[in-house]
């Protein structure tokens, strides 16, 4: 591989604003804000609105949309459409 062409890959904290959970991982993203982690070291922190900690798909708190009522209303409205009177 060529030297000096890859972005800086370093430890970064990600804070989920919806749940408040903070995750330490590695990323090429950076931030001017820093925060001290549990190990005593200081890392850049990036705040995200939603992550796997708060997304309904990953938390199992999905809402199922009930479209049956809308389909029934559509069928009632157009039940006689195209039929001669």
Swiss-Prot record:
It comes from the Bacteria. Keywords: Ribonucleoprotein, Ribosomal protein. Gene3D superfamilies: Ribosomal protein L31. It holds the Pfam family Ribosomal_L31. GO terms for cellular component: ribonucleoprotein complex; ribosome. InterPro entries: Ribosomal_bL28/bL31-like_sf, Ribosomal_bL31, Ribosomal_bL31_B, Ribosomal_bL31_sf. GO terms for biological process: translation. GO terms for molecular function: structural constituent of ribosome. Belongs to the bacterial ribosomal protein bL31 family. Type B subfamily. HAMAP family: Ribosomal_bL31_2. Part of the 50S ribosomal subunit. This is Large ribosomal subunit protein bL31B. The lineage of its organism: Bacteria, Bacillati, Actinomycetota, Actinomycetes, Micrococcales. The gene is rpmE2.
